[in-house]
């Protein structure tokens, strides 16, 4: 991922993550934006030069961007490699690009010496959950909430 691609991706990724957090937690969008910014500061402190991080731009055979993958060390500092973000352009969904990016994440994680890979998925994202389950991912923990 080039510096220009990183800048474009990061702005969109922060906003999308903030909207997901706001929806999942029932918090104001501005609070969720602060959480998203802090997450990126913590896990991407050096941008594309952050040690152990892979930022992959998925491209089709014509070189057109179809999606991105952010893979890095586990947030806890130990354990499996971690998929922080995977995004396929809305116009390219359903064509197998999400699966291809997930397979690339697994390849990169193995190359880095990992024997396990993990991710978080919002409970409302049924399409992503089906993809992950079809690739052999299983729930390790489930967080539940109820508004009062």
Predicted segment positions?
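Conserved acetyl-CoA-binding loop-helix of GNAT-fold acetyltransferases
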Residues: 85-88, 94-111, 130-134
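Conserved active-site alpha-helix within GNAT-family acetyltransferase domains
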Residues: 99-103, 123-141, 146-148
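Residue-level signal for the short linker/turn that defines the boundary of a DNA-recognition helix
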Residues: 81, 114, 126-127
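Acetyl-CoA-dependent GNAT
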Residues: 3-89, 104, 108, 139-148
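Residue-level detector of anion-binding/catalytic polar loops
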Residues: 115-116, 138
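Conserved hydrophobic beta-strand within the GNAT/NAT acetyltransferase core sheet
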Residues: 83-86, 117-121
């Amino acid at each position: 991922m080039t510096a220009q691609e990183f800048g474009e991706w990061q702005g969109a990724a922060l906003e999308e993550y903030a909207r997901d957090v706001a929806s999942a937690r029932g918090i104001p969008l501005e609070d969720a934006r602060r959480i998203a910014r802090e997450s990126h500061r913590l896990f991407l402190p050096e941008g594309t030069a952050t040690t152990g991080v892979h930022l992959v731009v998925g491209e089709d055979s014509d070189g057109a961007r179809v999606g991105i993958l952010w893979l890095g060390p586990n947030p806890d500092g130990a354990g499996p490699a971690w998929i922080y973000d995977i995004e396929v352009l809305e116009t390219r969904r359903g064509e197998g690009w999400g699966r291809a990016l997930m397979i690339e994440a697994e390849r990169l994680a193995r190359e880095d010496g990992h024997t396990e890979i993990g991710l978080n998925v919002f409970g409302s994202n049924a399409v992503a959950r089906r993809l992950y389950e079809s690739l052999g991912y299983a729930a390790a923990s489930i967080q539940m909430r109820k508004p009062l």
